[in-house]
């Protein structure tokens, strides 16, 4: 294999640039040309493809976002769109593709694989919801962003003796809510993977108040429901002064943590190795701090599950 491509797709995550850097430098080290595909699958279809040199990925390891940009692309879900993409890859002499992104990006890589084009998926999403890996690129950075917000909000919650509801990202996965809530000492954590009883939430808040607790922090994953509506219900049911903070897209930005930079470097380099070994149709990950790879079709057939023991621990510690 003499020429490979790399793209980022779907929602951006801190550390994507570190992964791009690793792909480019690893490939060039082995004498392979690398082409950056801009704006994800939409850019692939449109032929927004440019050769990348070592200098193009200098001074980016610490930067959030993605220098290749990203975009949603409904057209690539169609066979016609997929064939247009393959036509562009062949036009540029690209023989293998590294796809950095989340579940939707993996679905695109799977389709290319089914058309006979070698692809390797690299997990890049703050949601940490990709099967076959303990951690995804960007999760640790987003987690630290949320924890920083929790710590600051707790300061003002204490000063004003208020209850605060903090809504975090996670439409289908509760990892950000669970991990940040546990690390931030939240009194209640609500995630999409677990049912909750509003009466129980209110009863817990009242018990804490009776014990002399002057403030509370509640973490709500967006997939559970609106943090604003949740806050209204709590104030109406308890009479406690309640405020709501929706963290939103701040969770996707920022300079990646050391963990995410190292993770991205390891996974990006391993993706190139797999292509050079002739192993397309794979996705890379890290499990028990060891690099692993899986068949991308089999990986997508599985479902990411939240750590139930950690969830139970969070409930035990928030009495």
UniProtKB/Swiss-Prot annotation:
Active site: residue positions: 127
Cofactor(s) required, per the database record: Mg(2+)
InterPro entries listed in its UniProt record: ATP_PFK (IPR022953), ATP_PFK_prok-type (IPR012003), PFKA_ATP_prok (IPR012828), Phosphofructokinase_CS (IPR015912), Phosphofructokinase_dom (IPR000023), PKF_sf (IPR035966)
Keyword Transmembrane helix assigned: no
Binding sites annotated in the UniProt record for substrate: 125-127, 162, 169-171, 222, 243, 249-252
Residues that, per the record, bind Mg(2+): 103
Name the UniProt record assigns to this protein: ATP-dependent 6-phosphofructokinase
Organism for this UniProt entry: Geobacillus sp. (strain WCH70)
Gene: pfkA
């Amino acid at each position: 294999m003499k020429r490979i491509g790399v793209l980022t797709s779907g929602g951006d995550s801190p550390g994507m640039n570190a992964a791009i850097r690793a792909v480019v430098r690893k490939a060039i080290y082995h004498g392979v040309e690398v082409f950056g595909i801009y704006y994800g699958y939409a850019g692939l279809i449109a032929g927004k493809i440019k050769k990348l040199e070592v200098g193009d990925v200098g001074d980016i390891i610490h930067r959030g976002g993605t220098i290749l940009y990203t975009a949603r692309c409904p057209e690539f879900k169609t066979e016609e769109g997929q064939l247009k993409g393959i036509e562009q890859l062949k036009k540029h002499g690209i023989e293998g593709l590294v796809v950095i992104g989340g579940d939707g990006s993996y679905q695109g890589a799977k389709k290319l694989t089914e058309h006979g084009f070698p692809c390797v998926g690299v997990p890049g999403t703050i949601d940490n919801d990709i099967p076959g890996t303990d951690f995804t690129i960007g999760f640790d950075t987003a987690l630290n962003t949320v924890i920083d917000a929790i710590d600051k909000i707790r300061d003002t919650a204490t000063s004003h003796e208020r209850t605060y509801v903090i809504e975090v990202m996670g439409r289908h996965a509760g990892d950000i809510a669970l991990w940040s809530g546990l690390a931030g000492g939240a009194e209640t954590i609500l995630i999409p993977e677990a049912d909750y009883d509003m009466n129980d939430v209110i009863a817990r808040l009242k018990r804490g108040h009776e014990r002399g607790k002057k403030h509370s922090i509640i973490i709500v994953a967006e997939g559970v429901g609106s943090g604003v509506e949740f806050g209204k219900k709590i104030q109406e049911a308890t009479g406690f002064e309640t405020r709501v903070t929706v963290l939103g897209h701040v969770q996707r930005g920022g300079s990646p943590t050391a963990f995410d930079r190292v993770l991205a470097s390891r996974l990006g380099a391993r993706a190139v190795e797999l292509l050079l070994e002739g192993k397309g149709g794979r996705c890379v990950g890290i499990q028990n701090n060891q690099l692993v790879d899986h068949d991308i079709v089999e990986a997508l057939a599985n479902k990411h599950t939240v750590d139930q023991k950690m969830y139970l621990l969070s409930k035990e510690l928030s009495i």
